Design a protein with these regions (language model features):
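N-terminal secretory signal peptides
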Residues: 1-11
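N-terminal export leaders
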Residues: 11-38
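C-terminal segment of N-terminal export signals and the immediately downstream linker at the start
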Residues: 31-86, 92-93
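Glycine-rich, aromatic-bearing surface loops/beta-hairpins
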Residues: 35, 223-271
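Acidic/histidine-rich, surface-exposed loop or edge segments in extracytoplasmic proteins
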Residues: 90-107
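Histidine-anchored nucleotide/phosphate-binding helix
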Residues: 112-128
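Acidic helix-start/capping segments at beta-turn-to-alpha-helix junctions
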Residues: 130-152
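A glycine-rich helix N-cap at a beta->alpha junction
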Residues: 157-183
């Protein structure tokens, strides 16, 4: 698939690749989907999720309440217990009865991954009239760097990237997000290419899944480069990175191994 990159942000994939059921019970919310048009858009105001997306709104609210354990002292290479990852949030996603449902295999930070997710959401919601459409990012590879907070970037990642990237700009909120969502066809508005942001997509109902395997392998590479100011063990550093995933991220025990679980739950694979 070829569409314009988010920004490219000066980040070379070649260089970075060298870096080492809770069922929601929402039958009551299953009202018939209504086509989205100008009249409904006018009622959106500052809301990024369409008014008739009742199932998506219910899921988003449930996910916000689902626990995210972020107090680890040490984590193993392979997770074997549900309390080591965000099991409740994942099962909410598996049980989601809205749709269509799409899971994106996102691996490259310098690819147009956010742009593609945004375009998919726009077409499904506005063109195909599916307000309860959900897009999941199964994030790994260099794209996973976008799922760490400022603490991790300041402490490790700016140095790890050789100063090529100094902060996590993928979570910045662009000025376009301030435009009223009711003006959905505004080429400089909320749904435009100027608003490719993880935070904005989350507000629209997209979910970004993190990968424990990527956490483990990234921290292994960081240790090999000698970036370890606190002299942490590998399990302790992996725990620190896990504790500093961005708000709203859903930790999987391994995202490549979790994609089949999404597919079993009816999600369509996209790359």
């Amino acid at each position: 698939m070829t569409e314009q990159n988010d920004d490219q942000r000066g980040f070379s994939r070649r260089s970075t690749l060298a870096m080492p059921a809770a069922g929601l019970g929402i039958a009551a919310l299953g009202a018939a989907l209504s086509p989205i048009g100008v009249a409904e858009a006018a009622t959106m105001g500052d809301e990024f999720i369409p008014p008739h997306a009742t199932k998506l709104k219910a899921l988003t609210a449930a996910l916000a309440k689902a626990p995210r354990r972020r107090d680890f002292k040490s984590v193993p290479m392979i997770l074997t217990s549900a309390d080591q990852y965000d099991s409740e949030a994942l099962h909410l996603l598996f049980a989601y009865s809205g749709g269509p449902k799409q899971v994106w295999d996102n691996t490259a930070l310098d690819s147009p991954w956010l742009n593609l997710m945004r375009n998919s959401m726009n077409a499904q919601i506005w063109s195909w009239k599916h307000p309860d459409f959900i897009a999941i990012s199964a994030t790994h590879g260099t794209a996973h760097l976008a799922l760490y907070d400022k603490y991790i970037w300041d402490k490790y990642l700016t140095k790890f990237t050789g100063g090529k990237v100094k902060s996590n700009t993928w979570v910045d909120v662009p000025a376009a997000s301030k435009v009223s969502a009711s003006d959905y066809n505004n080429p400089k508005g909320v749904f435009s290419p100027l608003d490719n942001s993880i935070v904005v997509l989350q507000k629209r109902g997209a979910v970004f899944c993190a990968c424990h395997n990527e956490v483990w392998e990234l921290t292994m590479g960081i240790l090999k480069k000698g970036i370890n100011p606190d002299k942490l063990s590998h399990p302790a550093m992996a725990a620190e990175f896990t504790n500093h995933l961005i708000p709203g991220a859903v930790l999987t025990p391994g995202v490549v191994g979790t994609i089949p679980q999404f597919q079993l739950a009816g999600y369509q694979y996209a790359k």
